[in-house]
Amino acid sequence: MEKDQVVILEKRGVILVSGEDSRDFLQNIITNDINKVSNKNSVFSALLTPQGKYLNEFFIIQNVKGYLLDCSENSTGELIKDLSKYKLRSKVEIEDFSSEFVIGVINNSKFKELQEELKSNENTITYRDTPIFLDPRNRKLGARIISNLEKLYLTIKKLSLKIIDNKEYYSLAPVSYTHLTLPTTGIV
């Protein structure tokens, strides 16, 4: 992917976890440290069964309302169901925001340019009220933008980016990154 290109990822889901207990709630059930998540840092994490078996993986981004979880569209419903199992008496709301948010990916070089412009060296920056974060798994996978569609298009226009096809984006990824989500069926 070239510096001035962006791809809008299809088949991604966005879940909002909010409420006064949201930080403690997530800290107790995910594989990463929720205390690392701030408006300047985002993480990649997973949800496991109590026996340690894989259930789901997602990015966690801090939002004004709580935490956004960027996950596979196919697993959004299942992830909400799994998170809800652990809710118990926690003061937490778990909502599917997939219809309100989209995920875009920009080149790592463009992200570095924005970091310099905003005088930041963090892995998550806010550009015009839109969070943009460097993929914590591998910087070569670019930086993700999570926004509503209208705001994403305004950001794309302001940054003079050209939208490329999903297929072109995945064809540019190294073979080991073409299937980033683990299978959700057939796991014993």
Residue ranges and their predicted role:
Residues M1-L180:
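Basic, glycine/lysine-rich polyanion-binding surfaces/domains
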Residues H179-V188:
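Single conserved hydrophobic/aromatic residue that forms the stacking wall/gate
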